[in-house]
Regions:
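TRNA-recognition modules of translation machinery and tRNA-sensing kinases, especially anticodon-binding
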Residues: 1-164
Length: 166
């Protein structure tokens, strides 16, 4: 169906697939919020400054979808708008940690197809992601990264999903 509407790389979920997709999104968001993350619903379009501030531009410009009339970019990941909420801000250490979670559809012009080069993954141009973002003191960054990986790993294990080299 996606091929008919937009071309390859744009999936359509229908019936039980759509229901499962929605349930998983809600499950991940609920797990994240019950672990102290605040849910946000960021925009899926960002300006050039936001894409540049997160390193998407100029490095990944060829992978991003650009809307010429408005000079906006479709987000490749929720981290782009979420981290830009705090761009050019001074955050008091007493306000840390900042723990956010968000669901967004994401858009990338990813090359590749199912096979060894992409470890058996189908590369999609549109896909859904639930993400966690933490803003912390720099000296805590490695410890926090380990905590975030453990949090996600725990959720996947609860679902009895095999882990792809985390």
């Amino acid at each position: 169906m996606g091929n008919k509407v937009t071309g390859s790389g744009f999936p359509v979920y229908k019936g039980k697939g759509a229901t499962l997709q929605r349930a998983l999104i809600n499950y991940f968001l609920d797990k994240n919020t019950s672990s102290g993350y605040t849910e946000v619903q960021p925009p899926v379009l960002v300006n050039e400054e936001s894409a540049f501030a997160t390193g998407q531009l100029p490095d990944k410009e060829g992978q991003m979808y650009h809307i010429n009339n408005d000079d906006l970019y479709l987000i490749p990941t929720a981290e782009v708008p979420i981290t830009n909420f705090y761009r050019n801000s001074i955050i008091n250490s007493s306000d840390l940690p900042i723990k956010l979670t968000g669901y967004t559809p994401c858009f990338r012009r990813e090359a590749g197809s199912y096979g060894k080069d992409v470890r058996g993954l189908n590369r999609l141009h549109q896909f859904d992601k639930v993400e966690i973002v933490r803003i912390e003191k720099p000296e805590n960054s490695y410890k926090v990264l380990d905590e975030m990986v453990a949090h996600v790993k725990n959720i996947l294990e609860e679902l009895e999903l095999s882990l792809i080299h985390i």
